Amino acid sequence: GGCCSHPACFASNPDYC
């Protein structure tokens, strides 16, 4: 969930997931 579900967010925060 969270950033991991949003490609743009995941792209700028890869280590969050």
From Swiss-Prot:
<feature type="modified residue" description="Sulfotyrosine">
    <location>
        <position position="16"/>
    </location>
</feature>
<keyword id="KW-0872">Ion channel impairing toxin</keyword>
<keyword id="KW-0528">Neurotoxin</keyword>
<dbReference type="GO" id="GO:0005576">
    <property type="term" value="C:extracellular region"/>
</dbReference>
<comment type="similarity">
    <text>Belongs to the conotoxin A superfamily.</text>
</comment>
<keyword id="KW-0629">Postsynaptic neurotoxin</keyword>
<comment type="function">
    <text>Alpha-conotoxins act on postsynaptic membranes, they bind to the nicotinic acetylcholine receptors (nAChR) and thus inhibit them.</text>
</comment>
<dbReference type="InterPro" id="IPR018072">
    <property type="entry name" value="Conotoxin_a-typ_CS"/>
</dbReference>
<feature type="disulfide bond">
    <location>
        <begin position="3"/>
        <end position="9"/>
    </location>
</feature>
<keyword id="KW-0800">Toxin</keyword>
<dbReference type="GO" id="GO:0090729">
    <property type="term" value="F:toxin activity"/>
</dbReference>
<protein>
    <recommendedName>
        <fullName>Alpha-conotoxin-like AnIC</fullName>
    </recommendedName>
</protein>
<feature type="disulfide bond">
    <location>
        <begin position="4"/>
        <end position="17"/>
    </location>
</feature>
<feature type="region of interest" description="Ser-Xaa-Pro motif, crucial for potent interaction with nAChR">
    <location>
        <begin position="5"/>
        <end position="7"/>
    </location>
</feature>
<dbReference type="GO" id="GO:0030550">
    <property type="term" value="F:acetylcholine receptor inhibitor activity"/>
</dbReference>
<feature type="modified residue" description="Cysteine amide">
    <location>
        <position position="17"/>
    </location>
</feature>
<dbReference type="GO" id="GO:0099106">
    <property type="term" value="F:ion channel regulator activity"/>
</dbReference>
<keyword id="KW-1015">Disulfide bond</keyword>
<keyword id="KW-0765">Sulfation</keyword>
<dbReference type="GO" id="GO:0035792">
    <property type="term" value="C:host cell postsynaptic membrane"/>
</dbReference>
<keyword id="KW-0964">Secreted</keyword>
<keyword id="KW-0008">Acetylcholine receptor inhibiting toxin</keyword>
<keyword id="KW-0027">Amidation</keyword>
